[in-house]
């Protein structure tokens, strides 16, 4: 009876430690995912800003050229 209690106690103890380690790894993985999302969001915002700036520059140039042609001052 005593050996059975000892083995059950050992089994419970090892299972608890194993579960604790799995939860720590899961939490660590979730933290890495948040950083990756932030990095992706940062890259996408940068690309969007660059495209927006380039689009504004191209549109401004096109409007200047069109107004020059319409007024005949070119």
From Swiss-Prot:
This protein's GO CC annotations: extracellular region
Q: Tell me the classification of the organism that encodes this protein.
A: Eukaryota, Metazoa, Chordata, Craniata, Vertebrata
Q: What does this protein do?
A: Antimicrobial peptide.
Q: Which cysteines are joined by disulfide bonds?
A: 68-74
Provide the species name: Rana temporaria (European common frog)
Pfam families, alphabetized: Antimicrobial_2, FSAP_sig_propep
Which tissues show it? Expressed by the skin glands.
- Positions of the propeptide removed during maturation: 23-40
Q: Where can this protein be found? A: Secreted
Protein family: Belongs to the frog skin active peptide (FSAP) family. Brevinin subfamily.
Whether Ribosomal protein counts among this entry's keywords is no
Q: Name one GO biological process term.
A: defense response to bacterium
Q: What is this protein called?
A: Brevinin-2Tb
Signal sequence, renumbered to the chain: 1-22
Q: Which InterPro entries match?
A: Antimicrobial_frog_2, Frog_antimicrobial_propeptide
Q: Does the record's keyword annotation contain Signal? A: yes
**Which UniProt keywords are present, listed alphabetically?**
Amphibian defense peptide, Antibiotic, Antimicrobial, Cleavage on pair of basic residues, Disulfide bond, Secreted, Signal
